Swiss-Prot record:
One of its GO terms (biological process) is RNA splicing. This is Maturase K. The keyword DNA repair does not apply. The keyword Secreted does not apply. Belongs to the intron maturase 2 family. MatK subfamily. It comes from Medeola virginiana. One of its GO terms (molecular function) is RNA binding. Its main location: plastid.
Amino acid sequence: MEELQGYLKKNGSPQQHFLYPLLLQEYIYTLAHDHGLNSSIFYESIEFIGYDNKSSLVLVKRLITRMYQQNLFIYSVNDSNQNRFGGHTNFFYSHFFYSQMVSESFSVIVEIPFSLRLVSSLEEEEKEIPKSQNLRSIHSIFPFLEDKLFHLNNVSDILIPHPIHLEILVQTLQYWIQDVPSLHLLRFFLHKYHNLNSFIQNNKTIYVFSKENKRLFWFLYNSYVSECEFLFVFIRKKSCYLRSTSSGAFLERSHFYGKKEHIIVVCCNNFQKTLCPVKDLFMHYVRYQGKAILASRGTHLLMKKWRYYLVNFWQYYFHFWSQPYRMQINPLLNYSFYFMGYLSSVLINPYAVKNQMLENSFLIDTDINKFDTIIPGIPLIGSLSKVKFCTVSGHPISKPGWADLSDFDIIDRFGRICRNLSHYHSGSSKKQTLYRIKYILRLSCARTLARKHKSTARALLQRLGSGLVEEFFTEEEQFISFIFPKTTPFPLHGSHRERIWSLDIIRVNDLVNQII
């Protein structure tokens, strides 16, 4: 990053610098393919036959040259899946290697302006508002929901649609990066990628692209979502009838998320001609990645107006149609919606209050609304089964790929996964699902060690004793056990219901992110 900042200082302001020459810098590809920095602890590093995880600058230059040649894509289409990893020559010409190499390297480059903006914005915030540091945690969204949602009536689950064509994503990026060669290279790459996949799968190009080029796709997609919200706020403030309200935007390198309150609806038949404001002072909006939640104290009809507005907004400004069914409207009470790895709902808790007046006493029945968050067990177990920690039914299995590691590394990996999950799900009011996940990971760790030593999991657990259990504890659980002495000393079997929202989490846990 220091070298990148030095380059940008030599070439002008961050908004007008040229990113294209960075494609020819060796350290860019070292950074792009450094699995120690970019991979998750939940997944094993991807190792390709004939590829040493380091991009040669000569290969990169050849790759850019071959992008403009038709025969590259002919070779890619003719390559079979069986020969994709068979050798360096076939692997170089495979479309998987082509797309991965270009997209990962290019995504690192286009993230540079946003990373610098993030650093500069955080420095300014620390000078002006020192207490705003806690708002960077995505867990700060849940106290916001606890404070605002319990007295509202309706909630709308919104899945922000993907643009039909990748060109929409490039056009959105033009407002952020003013480097014509880089944008031209990106557009040419996406165009060739679309033509290549048209031979294989019809009408699924953007889906295939999102699976094979996750980092670049999420960067482009979140740029588009950020642009949606920017235009949305701009239109809202454009009308003199709409009062200005507080809003906060949170920027991360490849994930954007925001939190706004008191948003006012703008219903438009034609955005270029007429603005018809509809005011709702009790509308709240939160979003993370492609999932947004709208909650209102208004009627069901008002929520339908919101849905109508959003459908027309995407149609007129981004030129694609969004199906209304992607925005479900439900009454907030006793309805559960999935958001950021939690199953959230507003519950009605009945209470009986005893009122004493002189010699007479009587009971008053009252209901209190309470915002509740729990862990969805079945989706999380399904996520664990995808990465081979357990079966689909939740039966723990060994991790063969980790059996060659040392005992310390195996225990450390499982312990980190368990602690990260516990840390992220510390806000759940019911911990039974979390205890089951810990049990699965602990037994999977024991079976992996038993597989390595050609022993049984029971014998290994008896030999290690409580030493293995302590690796799966978090600092929060040890703190709770100290503060609340009634709970058992081992949170794995405890029954405490205390919720803790962490203020140091800037992204969703990777295992949870698979089911969002």
